[in-house]
Amino acid sequence: NILQFRKMIQCANKGSRAAWHYLDYGCYCGPGGRGTPVDELDRCCKIHDDCYIEAGKDGCYPKLTWYSWQCTGDAPTCNPKSKCKDFVCACDAAAAKCFAKAAYNKANWNIDTKTRCK
């Protein structure tokens, strides 16, 4: 679920960067996505997008699926409940952890995706 994902991001990065910073970053962070990721953070978003696609193939609705999780230290941890909930939670938790490890390059925020994402 998008709202839970936002909170997971805050958990993983210890509140150092608001989730909205990732909405228009690179070629894959935010709606849509195409081309080659511009950096490691953008690659995290592509992996997350691909994970959601796989969840959809399994009959799940990733953007709408509510799941159970908790913030343990600086790591989101999923609480197993059902196949879809676990799948989507794992997608979001992995992405949040990936975001926390990747550098944020302000030059890759709000880029011209038509020219840079081929």
Curated annotation (Swiss-Prot):
Molecular function terms, GO-annotated: calcium ion binding; calcium-dependent phospholipase A2 activity; phospholipid binding
Signal peptide: none
GO CC term (a single one): extracellular region
Disulphide linkage map: C11-C71, C27-C117, C29-C45, C44-C98, C51-C91, C60-C84, C78-C89
Keywords: Calcium, Disulfide bond, Hydrolase, Lipid degradation, Lipid metabolism, Metal-binding, Secreted
CDD domains in the cross-refs: PLA2c (cd00125)
Chief localization: secreted
Official protein name in the record: Basic phospholipase A2 PA-15
Species for this entry: Pseudechis australis
